[in-house]
Amino acid sequence: MHLQPSTAVVTGAASGIGFALSARLAQAGARVVMTDIAGDGLAGAVEELAAHGADVTAVVADLTDPAAVQELADTAFGRLGDIDVVCNNAGVVGPVGMPLWSVPLDEMHAVFDVNYWAHVHVARAFVPRLLDSGRPSHLVQTASMSAFVVGAGTASYAASKHADLAAARSLRADLDGTPVRVSVLCPGRVDTPMTRGLVAPRNATGNTTISADEAADAVWNALGSDRFYIFTNADAQTRLGDQFNDVWRHLAREKYWTESSSPSVNSSRP
């Protein structure tokens, strides 16, 4: 059953997928708290949506700071009352195109601070209150196809997205049997300010590009459902197949099963 949200919180909302999510939710009539560390960009985003009649509130916050995230939660619940949807969307690309041993450690830590730890802080601040409300709600974690598909030169970004996917899977198990649904958004290439100018990493396969609005529509269609993985790009099956078939081939070499009996990602079975 589709969840028709009346309230929502979106992180990383100043641009890209976060802005598109905020716009999609507001368009459907939801009151939205939009948060980002980029104060000027956030102010412009809120002004743009408000000019079209959206009920949106800006909260500038550094989500890598647990205390700031708790303050965000206090503000959001105080402004909105019960919250139906939390889009845990903040993210950065960080250094790409360098082998792991060449990436400055402080830059790698900075990527994890946003792509993993900020998501952990948001989940810890919001999920207990979502549970306390006893109402149906939905937590959407923005990961990436890089949570599955890894190319050369993506050590920081891909590893942080793997960690975020693991956290989302754990949250889904933790919240099983409760009114709180969990989904993980795994977009491929999306045309956003964060990704413009980037080239595909060496050894990467697939390069279809979608708009941020298309990613937001995919999230909207999943709200209230038990759909955990939200894949957005047309090449997702091919890219995942390339990765997982490689795993099956390695397992087959170790005699765990034969090539003929190994699972197939491209199987026509549901």
Curated annotation (Swiss-Prot):
Reactions that this protein is recorded to catalyse: 1-deoxy-11beta-hydroxypentalenate + NAD(+) = 1-deoxy-11-oxopentalenate + NADH + H(+)
Gene behind this protein: ptlF
Known pathway: Antibiotic biosynthesis; neopentalenolactone biosynthesis
Location of the active site: Y157
GO MF term (any one): oxidoreductase activity, acting on the CH-OH group of donors, NAD or NADP as acceptor
pH note: Optimum pH is 8.0.
Alphabetized PANTHER family for the sequence: 5-KETO-D-GLUCONATE 5-REDUCTASE, ALCOHOL DEHYDROGENASE, PUTATIVE (AFU_ORTHOLOGUE AFUA_3G03445)-RELATED
SMART domains (UniProt xref): PKS_KR (SM00822)
Assigned EC number: 1.1.1.340
The name this protein goes by in its record: 1-deoxy-11-beta-hydroxypentalenate dehydrogenase
Miscellaneous field: S.avermitilis does not produce pentalenolactone itself in vivo but instead a group of new metabolites that are neopentalenolactone derivatives.
Classification via NCBIfam families: HdxpentlteDhPtlF
GO BP terms: antibiotic biosynthetic process; lactone biosynthetic process
InterPro entries hit by this protein: HdxpentlteDhPtlF (IPR054968), NAD(P)-bd_dom_sf (IPR036291), SDR_fam (IPR002347)
Gene3D superfamilies: NAD(P)-binding Rossmann-like Domain
Function noted in UniProt: Catalyzes the oxidation of 1-deoxy-11-beta-hydroxypentalenic acid to 1-deoxy-11-oxopentalenic acid in the biosynthesis of neopentalenolactone antibiotic.
Record-listed substrate binding positions: S144
Similarity comment: Belongs to the short-chain dehydrogenases/reductases (SDR) family.
